[in-house]
Amino acid sequence: MVRVIAHRGASAAAPENTVEAFRLAHELGADWVELDARRTADGKVIVHHDAELADGRTIVELERVELPDHVCDLTDALDACEGMSINIEIKNWPADPDFDETESVARAVVGLVQERSLHDRVLISCFHYPTIQLVRELDPAIRTAFLHILIDRSWEELAADVAADGHTALHPWDGLVDEALMAAASAHGLEVNVWTVDDPDRMAQLVALGVHGLCTNVPDVARHVLDAS
C-alpha cells in the first residue's frame, strides 16, 4: 500500500513543522508525517526546516527559550504524531551554519527513538550520507533513508551502495523519479518515497510507477488519489 507522508505536516493548511500541522495531517488522512530536526545552542532538538528563523537569527546560536512559541521540541512533535509513523529528517548539511561533524542531533534522535521504543514507527533520513551511516552504527534496528536531489552515479550503483549499507529506502526529489530509478531500487530491495508531490495527476503517475510513499503538502489530496486508484 502506498503511504501518504505529510510534508512538514499538513503544511498547505497549517504552519509547517508545528504541532497544529501534525495533528491536522492525521485528520486529513496521512499515514506518516515528515519533519525536520535541528539543534539549539543549549543542545535541545527542535523541529524547523531552515537553519535560520524568519527574522534571520540562526537557531544554533539561540537557546531554546529564545525561539518563537510555534517552534516545537521534537518530543512534542512525536506526541502530536500519535497514530502515524514519523520520518525524521536530520538537518546536517555541510553548507549549513549548524553543521555538526559530531552528529549531536543524530545521536539525540537515536536516543529518543530508543527511549520511547519507536523503532516500528520511525524512519530517519538525511541528505548527508554519513549521518544515516552513523544512525545505522548506533542502532541497526532503526530504519534509514537517503535523501537526494542530485546523483553522482547511475541509479544501479546508488541503489546497490545504499542497500549494501543496510538502509531501507531512497527519498528522491520528484523530478528524478523514472522507471530506471524504480527498477534499480526494486532490484536491491529498497523502498522509494518521493518528495514533494502536490499535483494529483503526478501522484497517480508515481503510484503507477510503483513508489511506496508520496511526501506531500496536501495529504488530503493524496489520500483521495490513492483511494480512487
Write out the residue ranges for each language-model feature:
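An active-site metal/cofactor-coordinating segment within enzyme catalytic domains
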Residues: 4, 31, 37-84, 90-93, ...
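Aromatic/hydrophobic pocket-lining residues that form the small-molecule binding cavity
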Residues: 18, 70, 74, 106
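Residues in well-ordered alpha-helical elements
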Residues: 16-19, 65, 75, 220
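Residue-level signal for the nucleotide or nucleotide-sugar donor/cofactor binding architecture
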Residues: 13, 69-72, 217
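Short loop-to-alpha-helix "cap/lid" segments that border enzyme active sites
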Residues: 75-76, 81-86, 90-229
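Conserved N-terminal beta1-alpha1 strand-loop-helix module at the mouth
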Residues: 2-49, 112, 121
